[in-house]
A protein has these predicted regions:
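Alpha-helical residues within the helix-turn-helix
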Residues: 28, 39, 74
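Short, charged recognition helix plus adjacent turn
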Residues: 2-6, 74, 81-104
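A short, Lys/Arg-rich alpha-helix, primarily the initiator
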Residues: 2-31
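Residues within the helices of the helix-turn-helix
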Residues: 24-25, 35, 70
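DNA major-groove recognition helix of helix-turn-helix
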Residues: 52, 68, 76, 84-87
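Short alpha-helical DNA-recognition segment
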Residues: 31-57
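Short, basic-rich loop-to-helix N-cap that marks the start of a DNA-contacting helix
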Residues: 55-74
Length: 104
């Protein structure tokens, strides 16, 4: 298994952390428990807690499914845009920095 450490991976880690912060803040504002949001989202409590921590396992940023990204804000009574940070990381950096032959 390869460990990613490029700038795009740091950007993704920061982005995942911001999503986690937003999820936690919105859950607290709605006075809901992990169990409440997990149940309403169709997730396990454990999975929901991982998303709120921003990590799927230590050192690995959370990477929620599209379904989870749509279900969690609905469970919280907010829009998807309330969860997603405004600045989207450019995940193409590795591709853009590769030599032209690597793109063929």
């Amino acid at each position: 298994m390869t460990t990613r450490t490029g700038p795009e991976d740091e950007a993704w880690s920061d982005y995942a952390s911001e999503i986690a912060t937003n999820l936690r803040r919105l859950r607290h504002e709605a006075s809901l428990s992990h169990e409440d949001v997990a149940y309403r989202s169709g997730l396990t409590r454990y999975t929901h807690q991982k998303y709120e921590k921003g990590h799927s396992k230590p050192g690995t940023p959370a990477n929620p499914t599209i379904r989870s990204l749509l279900a969690m804000p609905q469970a919280l009574g907010v829009s998807l845009m309330d969860i997603l940070p405004a600045k989207i990381p450019d995940l193409r950096l590795r591709y853009l920095q590769a030599p032209p032959a690597a793109h063929a």
